Amino acid sequence: MASWGSCDFHELRDLNERIKAAASEQEMDAFYTGLLDEMMNGLLTDVKELTPVDRGHLRRNWFITKAKRSGKVYHADIYNNIEYAPYVENGHRQEVGRYVPAIGKRLVNGFVEGRHMLREGLFDLQRDAPDFIKTKSEKFLSRMMEGK
């Protein structure tokens, strides 16, 4: 019988061990929560930039929660606890002809359009997320393959 030579598979065994070690649940959990936290920080920055400013109170009160795992799902929240935030986001009705002393004029329009800062920020996040996730995943996998 002919001999085809010998193969040393120690590098493949090492790679398999590194994958098992890096793919531990704790490391994967840390990767996913870190990824979501970074995405939420970017969203927070975008939403704050899109928020209109009079005295800055609305802009200063945007907050995010830390990413959490619930079963197989990771989630985080963005919120603004100012009572008039939904009216700035979505718009609101107003009484035409009413005098407003703060601006010294009567109201002319029956509806004030919303600024949609959260909605626009979420659209930007959805647009940019695939490339961001791909880049971070590639870095994570390359670290895993190098054994770092």
Language-model segments: which ranges?
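Short, Lys/Arg-rich flexible segments
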Residues: 1-79, 83-85, 95-148
